[in-house]
Amino acid sequence: MISSRQDQTGAPLSSSTTTTTPVVAPISVVDHGLPYDTHNLYDVSFNNTHTIYTLLTSDPSLVDSWISTVLRDHQQRVLTVGLDIEWRPNTQRNMQNPVATLQLCVAERCLVFQILHSPSIPPSLVSFLADPNITFVGVGIQEDVEKLLEDYNLNVANVRDLRSFAAERLGDLELKRAGLKSLGLRVLGLEVAKPKRVTRSRWDNPWLTAQQVQYAAVDAFLSYEIDRRLSSYN
C-alpha cells in the first residue's frame, strides 16, 4: 500500500510509484472548419473533463488578439503558461529544421502559432515571452527556449522545468529524467497517448491535420495542468 499526498482539491499526489492500472485519458477533437486562409478553431476534449479551445494560426494579428485576451483575463493574477514547440523531424545529418509551431496554453485556452509560415513575429509575442512576471512551464523547456532563440531570436525570460519542479514537490529525484507522458501519469494519474506517427509528422506543413492540432494543444495543456497541480500542493 503506498502513501499519497494531496493537493488543495484533495486529489492525490503520489510520492511513489503507483501500482494501480493507469487511466487512459480519452481525447478527441472537433474541427470547426472555418472558411479562412488565416486561421481555424478546434475544440479538444481531454479526459471528458476539459475542453481546450484552440486557435491555429500563422496570422500575427490573431496572435496579438490571443495575447491581449489572456493578459486582460489574468491581469490580477500570477500568469503561468504551458509552452511547447514542434518542428519537422531532422532526417539529415548536421541539418536542424527550424521550429514550425509554438504552442502556448493558459487554462483551457491554447494557441498553436505556425511561426514558420508567419509573415512576421508580432511585437506582442516578443514582449509576452520576455515578460519576467510570466512563468512559462514545460518538460525540457530550457532546450525549447534555446531553439526559439536560435531560430527566431525570441527570448523567453522566465521558465520552470516541470521535471525539476515535480522532483522537488514529490521528493523523487528520478522525476528529473521523466518525460511529459511520465509526468502526466505520475502527477495527474492519466496516461496520455503520444502516437509516433503524429510526433514525427510534417509539422512544417502550411495546414496541420486535426490530429496534429490535438497533439500540439494537449502537450501545452498538460504542461499547464501538471504545473497547476504541483503548485497547489502544500
Question: How would you label these PLM feature ranges?
Answer:
Residues 52-64, 78-80, 89-210, 214, ...:
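Conserved DEDDh/DEDDy metal-dependent 3′-5′ exonuclease domain
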